[in-house]
């Protein structure tokens, strides 16, 4: 028999102590995400810069090497704004992130004729080439800051999953989409910065 340590007041407001505690995952994060969004579009890296001469001033400027980073960030911002509930306040606490990027498999990986939908056996199973996974994460994290999902991407303190796969893995690998894009989840980090905890 459980004996209460104090008597609850009859205020009509449920006690916060009566709530079921949130379950935590294996790495100290809450099992239900704070924020979740599915973004469609071609993921693009951010971070590689090229020197270009300004036609008007003649000065050298550093510009993003990938022209696709702007449209990708716009896709992330638009999807994140749609996914945010009304009255959303940007996250201000440390978060753990999961990002599963889906890339379109190049046409050269497929057969021809009646085998046009079949991946050639000689094609790579994984996208172990450009774009770099870390640069995909960088562009996506910055876009989430722009969408005010969190105050700053410096709040990302760990990754639960950071994955890139081809769209042909849809249904075989969790969160791989049927078309190019990304599944993003953010969790609060429980016990962050508690010494000895």
PLM regions: where:
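Acidic, proline/glycine-enriched N-terminal capping motif
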Residues: 1-197
């Amino acid at each position: 028999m459980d004996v209460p340590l104090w008597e609850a007041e009859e205020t009509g407001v449920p006690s916060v102590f009566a709530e079921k505690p949130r379950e935590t995952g294996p790495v100290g994060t809450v099992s239900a995400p704070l924020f979740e969004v599915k973004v469609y579009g071609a993921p693009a890296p951010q971070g590689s810069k090229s020197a270009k001469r300004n036609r008007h001033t003649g000065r050298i400027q550093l510009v993003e090497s990938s022209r696709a980073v702007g449209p990708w960030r716009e896709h992330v911002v638009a999807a994140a704004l749609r996914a945010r509930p009304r009255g959303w306040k940007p996250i201000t606490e440390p978060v753990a992130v999961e990002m599963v990027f889906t890339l379109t498999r190049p046409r050269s990986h497929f057969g021809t004729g009646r085998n046009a939908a079949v991946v050639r056996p000689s094609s790579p199973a994984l996208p172990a080439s450009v774009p770099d996974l870390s640069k995909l994460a960088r562009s996506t994290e910055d876009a989430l800051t722009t969408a005010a999902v969190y105050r700053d991407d410096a709040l990302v303190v760990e990754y639960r999953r950071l994955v890139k796969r081809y769209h042909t893995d849809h249904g075989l690998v969790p969160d791989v989409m049927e078309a190019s894009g990304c599944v993003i989840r953010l969790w609060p980090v429980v016990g962050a910065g508690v010494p000895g905890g």
